[in-house]
Amino acid sequence: MISVEVFDDRRCWLGEGPTATGENNNHLQWVDILNGKVLSKNIETSKTSEYKMDEHVGFAIPRTDGGHVLGTANGPVLRDVEGNISGLPKRETDTYKSRWNDAKVSHTGDLFLGTLSYDLVPKASGLYRISKDGSEIKKLLSDVTLANGLDWSVDTQTFYFIDSLKHYVDAFSYDGQEITDRRTVIKFGENEIPDGMCVDGEDGLWIAFWDGSQVRRYDEKYKLSEKIDLPVSYTTSCTFAGKDLDQLVITTAHNNEMGKHPQAGMTFICKPGIKGKKTTLFGI
């Protein structure tokens, strides 16, 4: 049994998108989407910080210069270490009011990012790619309802993507630019809602389940191999961190259930016995 403990007791309405940076992968960063916050904590020193934007922030992807790419509702935007904001290419005008949700950087440096409509209109959202130099945005998938977890296999040739309300994980072939050959590799029950995810160093998929109180690992053959139970309902995402990338950090949401679960919205940490991959930074 893998036991968890509280890593950070700041309660997030909707904690999401953890990343680990720094020389020892010890600087954790994540967002509280609906409060527009970007939070951080150092594993080794326990030093914390945060800043707040004036709109919802779906993700905060670290940049090589120390700033972030922020998935603000009207973005995405670049934010430097001094807080200065500059724009990136925008997606097409939304038919339905939408925001950015999850994102990750490929090994080639491109930013993959997805959307959701606030009313969760079926197939009204998409998955996009912003080029590593920030000059171009391209829509990769258009039949998306709630774009969520995404990551790549260790050899980078397989791209994984979760559209939460479809209740499965899709895999694609990836050539460093395009995604092709879409196929479903893991199916869940209609009451199971997969959220954020990450891939470990053995090609296992660690998936957080919204309203499921769990993070699960599926091995390289897509078979369930581990379960991590949490004392909250809404687990949202996870990432590996620490000098040896052997610690799994898990974000959660309180979703107005702090009375039912006192630790709801806090961020947790555990040692699952498997090492992960480093966070890839965005280069501009």
Give each language-model segment a name.
Residues R10-N25, M53-V69, D94-D110, L140-T158, ...:
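Beta-rich, blade/repeat-based domains predominating
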Residues K37-L39, G75-V77, S125-Y128, Y168-D170, ...:
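A short loop-to-beta-strand structural motif that recurs across blades of beta-propeller domains
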Residues Y168, I186-E220:
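Loop/turn-rich, solvent-exposed surfaces of beta-rich toroidal or solenoidal domains
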Residues T21-E23, L28-L34, V69-N74, L113-V121, ...:
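Conserved beta-strand positions in repeat-built beta-propeller and related beta-rich domains
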Residues N84-L140:
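Hydrophobic alpha-helical segments and helix pairs
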Residues N42-S46, D80-N84, S131-G134, S173-Q177, ...:
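Short loop/turn segments that connect beta-strands within beta-propeller blades
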Residues S3-D9, S46-K52, S86-T93, S135-S142, ...:
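A short beta-strand motif characteristic of beta-propeller blades
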Residues T239-I284:
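Blade-level signature of beta-propeller repeat domains, shared across WD40, Kelch, NHL, RCC1
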